[in-house]
Amino acid sequence: MKLLTTKITRTAITVVLVVLAFIAIFRAWSFYTESPWTRDARFSADVVAIAPDVAGLITSVDVHDNQLVKKDQVLFTIDQPRYQKALEEAEADVAYYQALANEKRREAGRRNQLGVQAMSREEIDQANNVLQTVLHQLAKAEATRDLAKLDLQRTVIRAPADGWVTNLNVYTGEFITRGSTAVALVKQNSFYVQAYMEETKLEGVRPGFRVEITPLGSNNVLHGTVDSVSAGVTNASSTRDAKGMATVDSNLEWVRLAQRVPVRIRLDKQPGNLYPAGTTATVVVTGERDRDRSQESAFNKLMHRLREFG
């Protein structure tokens, strides 16, 4: 009898443990698959690719890599003497055509005043036509002067906004061409998080929902708000061939990988450059309000920790 009781007790304990294990596994599985969260999230920021509008030798570089700069602060300067001479030449052309236009205006005025009684209509018309030609040349010279003045101004490259200089790859003495990217500027106070959520979790993601962000390798938890959800993503399994026909990749009907959709998250507080653009984080959407961690069960706390750092 005692042996039977022992067997029943052991069997009952085993059954209870198996049931508890199944419950724990089911809850963990539900927690991981149904709640809107992702480890595939990255800090992003507005980045300006700075390229000069003029070409020439770089005469000075006034900043260093990763420096925080203010709007309109000088970054580097390009060959000002050359463009100063071009401006002086353009101004000389303007002065020449102004003097010529004044002379032709006086001549045309005299001929118009004398009229056909003193000279032929052809001579009068010729004087007026010469005046119009000179005036057009003057307008062209003034436009060239204005462009030369603009080019001279643009030899000084300035920061378009407050931010951090990054990937600075220009040096004094180098020749830089027009339109070639010289440096990137990461705008200050423009950081946000781009989270790539699986399509199966988008039901729990809405603009205005609160979000927890845990940077990889950090114990800090940042908070933010869902700003927007992308309206579309590229279909990688369907392309076009050279004749425009659809090319669709073969797949297994019983294997379906969830597509990831970009979700833009607005941060409550800007972290500066503590978390550089491109670094990764774990994102958890908590719904219409922030999660009260003090009221969570030990199981949920454990799951959150595993989710954030697993």
UniProtKB/Swiss-Prot annotation:
Gene3D superfamilies referenced in this protein's UniProt entry, alphabetically: 2.40.30.170, 2.40.50.100
Organism superkingdom: Bacteria
Subcellular localization(s) per the UniProt record: Cell inner membrane
Signal peptide residues on this chain, from the entry's feature table: none
Topology versus the membrane: Single-pass membrane protein
SS bond partners: none
Gene Ontology MF terms in the entry: transmembrane transporter activity
Alphabetized UniProt keyword annotations: Cell inner membrane, Cell membrane, Membrane, Transmembrane, Transmembrane helix, Transport
GO cellular component, one term: plasma membrane
Transmembrane segments: 12-32
Main location: membrane
Family statement: Belongs to the membrane fusion protein (MFP) (TC 8.A.1) family.
Protein task: Forms an efflux pump with AaeB.
Name of the protein: p-hydroxybenzoic acid efflux pump subunit AaeA
Species for this entry: Cronobacter sakazakii (strain ATCC BAA-894)
